[in-house]
Structures are given as structure tokens and as C-alpha cells.
Amino acid sequence: MNFQSRILTVPKTARFSIKLPESGKADTFWLLIHGYAQLATDFLSEFEFIKNEDHLLTAPEGLSKFYFRNKIGASWMTKEDRENEISDYVNYLNLLMEKIKKEYDLKDATFNLLGFSQGVHTAVRFFIKGEYNFNNLILCSSDFPKDTDFIKLNEKLKKSKMYFIHGTSDSAITNERFNESIKLLYENKIEFEDISFDGDHVLNKKLLFDLFCK
């Protein structure tokens, strides 16, 4: 038999969670990319520490859901058919950004793109491949994707700042992997701020608040 693998692009319903600015106009926008097996609403709740009335927060949810430890989680991609999955979520995030910018006044806002855990790789790829620019690329608790187009990343970072944030006792990512990522970034002449904290595989809320919410 002549078996063939083909692809078909189809419409898909995507879910996201949003926290609107109480003041009606946002001076800071956050695109928050969750980690493996998380859901958008749960991830957005991690940012309740952002009390600023003029911050608009949006957490998109990965397009693939699955059962995980008797709960439901979402994922951004797997190794299987990875290029199409990357293309799908870049297109999805482009459409989400288009919708948000049409519906809310973000003309003078600061744009923050934050990725946590698996969401770091998604955030980096969207930062490079996406149609929108961000003032800050904030990468929390993950190694850095080795297949990055560093030429394009350097070009994008001319108008942005990148933060590489990691715990010294991360139970998911070893210090060796963090150090390999830092070395990779330096070798490719990437300007970034390396920030470590005493802690596990978590979002350091105090650190994020001090950096971006004061």
C-alpha cells in the first residue's frame, strides 16, 4: 500500500483569558504564555500581584489539551510535526494580538511578552516570527531554544530588552542547562539581563513586580 501523510489547514477555536484595566486605558500590556500542562485562567491568576489599574493582561491557551494527573492541561507543541505546530501558534498569537489592539486603546502602551517554562520557547519564537513588537521579552524558568534564529533575534532586540530569569534550585531545569543557555546567548552576542533568584521552578512574583510594576 502507498501510505502518504498530508496536511489540511482547518479553523480552530482558541481560548484566552484577559484582565482589563480598571482605568479603561492601558499604559502596559502583558501577553502571558503559560507552561506545560497549565490552563490560561489558572496562569492568569498567578499575576494577581499586578494591582496596577492601567495594566491589561492577556493569557492565551495552548491549542492542544490533554489529561494530566487527573486534571486537564494545555500544551503549545510536541516534537511531532513541530514546524506546523509552531506555525499554528504563531498565527494564533498574531490573530489574538490583532483582536486585542483593535478592541483596546494601546497606542502609547509598553508591551511585555512573558513566557514561563514551556512558554519560554513559544514566547521566543513568537517574538521573532510574529508580526508585533514588544518592549520587553521576559523569559522565566526555562532553558533557551537552541534552534533560535539569532540574527533575527539580535535585530528584534535593537528596540527591546530581554530578561532571562531562573531559580538556583529549579527542580525542572538543571543549573547546567541554564548555564548552557547563558553561554549560547553570549556566543551569539545577544544582549540580555541574566537574573537568578533563590527558588524552585516558579514565577518569582516579587522580582517581576519590582522590575515591571513599580
Where are each of the predicted segments found?
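A conserved short beta-strand
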Residues: Y132-F144
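C-terminal catalytic histidine-bearing segment of alpha/beta-hydrolase fold enzymes
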Residues: Y163, E176-K214
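Serine-hydrolase catalytic machinery in alpha/beta-hydrolase-like enzymes
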Residues: L8-L106
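Active-site signature of alpha/beta-hydrolase-fold catalytic machinery across serine-
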Residues: S45, R125-K129
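Short alpha-helix in the alpha/beta-hydrolase fold that links the catalytic acid
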Residues: F43-E46, F150, T174-L184
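Gly/Ala-rich beta-loop-alpha elbow adjacent to hydrolase catalytic centers
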Residues: L114-G119, A123
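Short beta-strand/loop motif that positions the catalytic acidic residue
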Residues: Y163-H166, D170
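Alpha/beta-hydrolase fold nucleophile elbow
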Residues: D105-G115
